[in-house]
C-alpha cells in the first residue's frame, strides 16, 4: 500500500462536499541546483501522481473543489481538475504584497481554481445566496501558507463536510490530510 492509499484509508467511507487542495507541484524551471522554491520546504509531486490520487473515494457525488495553482502550474491544475471529475467554474486570485520567483515575470499572485462535480444548491444566508469574491488581497506570510480569507470564503460558500489535502495545520470543522499535520 503506498503512502497516498494509506493516508486516504483514514477517510474510508467518508464523502466530502468540499475539497480544498494545495498540491506540491513540480514545474520545470530554469536555473541551477540551488533549492529556492517549494522543493526547499517539502517533497514535490509529479502531476501524474497528483492526478492519480484517489479523489473519487472521498468526493461526494455533489462536491466543490478548490485547487491552488501558481501561474506556472495553471495548465496542470486544469488538467488535474478534469482528471478528478470536476468542471472548472472560476479562479480566485490572491494578490500578495511581495514579489516572488519567476523567469520572465516575477509573480505576486496565486490562483485557487474552483470547480464542481454534480450539482450542489447554493448556500443561503438570511435568504440570500452566499457568494465569494474572485480576488483576495492579503499579505504573504511564510512559504506556501495561504490567505486566511480563502478558508473563510470557502466556509461561507461551500458545504460541509470539508477536507483539506496537503494541509499544514488543523482547523475546527475540517478534516485534514498532509505530511505537515
Tell where the protein language model's regions lie, with residue ranges.
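Class I S-adenosyl-L-methionine-dependent methyltransferase catalytic core
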Residues: 1-181
Amino acid at each position: 500500500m503506498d503512502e497516498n492509499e494509506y493516508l486516504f484509508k483514514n477517510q474510508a467511507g467518508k464523502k466530502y462536499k468540499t475539497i480544498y487542495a494545495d498540491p506540491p507541484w513540480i514545474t520545470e524551471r530554469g536555473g541551477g541546483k540551488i533549492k529556492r522554491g517549494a522543493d526547499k520546504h517539502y517533497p514535490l509531486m509529479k502531476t501524474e501522481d497528483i492526478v492519480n490520487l484517489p479523489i473519487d473515494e472521498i468526493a461526494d457525488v455533489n462536491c466543490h473543489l478548490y485547487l491552488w495553482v501558481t501561474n506556472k502550474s495553471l495548465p496542470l491544475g486544469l488538467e488535474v481538475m478534469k482528471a478528478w471529475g470536476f468542471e472548472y467554474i472560476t479562479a480566485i486570485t490572491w494578490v500578495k504584497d511581495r514579489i516572488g520567483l519567476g523567469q520572465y515575470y516575477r509573480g505576486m499572485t496565486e490562483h485557487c481554481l474552483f470547480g464542481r462535480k454534480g450539482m450542489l444548491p447554493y448556500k443561503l444566508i438570511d435568504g440570500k445566496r452566499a457568494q465569494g469574491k474572485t480576488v483576495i488581497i492579503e499579505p504573504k506570510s511564510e512559504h506556501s501558507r495561504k490567505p486566511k480569507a480563502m478558508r473563510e470564503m470557502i466556509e461561507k460558500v461551500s458545504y460541509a463536510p470539508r477536507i483539506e489535502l496537503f494541509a499544514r495545520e488543523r482547523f475546527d470543522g475540517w478534516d485534514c490530510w498532509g505530511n505537515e499535520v
